[in-house]
UniProtKB/Swiss-Prot annotation:
Protein name: Protein GrpE
One function term, GO molecular function aspect: unfolded protein binding
Record's function text: Participates actively in the response to hyperosmotic and heat shock by preventing the aggregation of stress-denatured proteins, in association with DnaK and GrpE. It is the nucleotide exchange factor for DnaK and may function as a thermosensor. Unfolded proteins bind initially to DnaJ; upon interaction with the DnaJ-bound protein, DnaK hydrolyzes its bound ATP, resulting in the formation of a stable complex. GrpE releases ADP from DnaK; ATP binding to DnaK triggers the release of the substrate protein, thus completing the reaction cycle.
Main localization category: cytoplasm
Keyword terms, alphabetized: Chaperone, Cytoplasm, Stress response
Pfam families referenced in this protein's UniProt entry, alphabetically: GrpE
Keyword Nucleotide-binding among record annotations: no
Assembly: Homodimer.
GO biological process: protein folding
Family under the similarity heading: Belongs to the GrpE family.
Species the sequence originates in: Thermotoga maritima (strain ATCC 43589 / DSM 3109 / JCM 10099 / NBRC 100826 / MSB8)
Amino acid sequence: MSEKEKKELTQECEELKEKYKELEEYAKRLKAEYENYREEVAREKRELIKNANEYLISKLIPVLDDFERALNQGEKGDAFYEGVKMIYKKLLNVLEKEGLTKIHVGEKFDPFEHEAVERVETEDVEEYTILEVVESGYKFHGKVLKPAKVKVAVKPRKKEERKVEEPSDKKE
């Protein structure tokens, strides 16, 4: 083998090594892009499922409200009442496993979680204290689907003496 042939083979070998490195880098990029694509598709799928669940659960909230109203009207100890209570608890348990949580009503009114349906003037408790829950509220994975409807304490309005001005007959 001549010196020229060796040089040509060495050059060809170097070119092939370079081409191999380029292809190897290209393959790594493709693999990374594919992994990112798979993760994106999986994330979108989870988001789609979450949104579908949120939609369905939001449609079931009025059913939970109806169960609560029925239980508030029923007589404890009655077999029918106990059956309705059992079904309500099962439904609520299933929905809670999917991410639904009842909004727990604390002492203070929170406009992000509560809807004031009545203002009760009183000095017995601190202003904006929740006096009564009219309807339960619900969250789904931290997002408020339905605010709790509550009665809120407010300070009594001071009755101010108002001066009533008589209309004047002057025309300018």
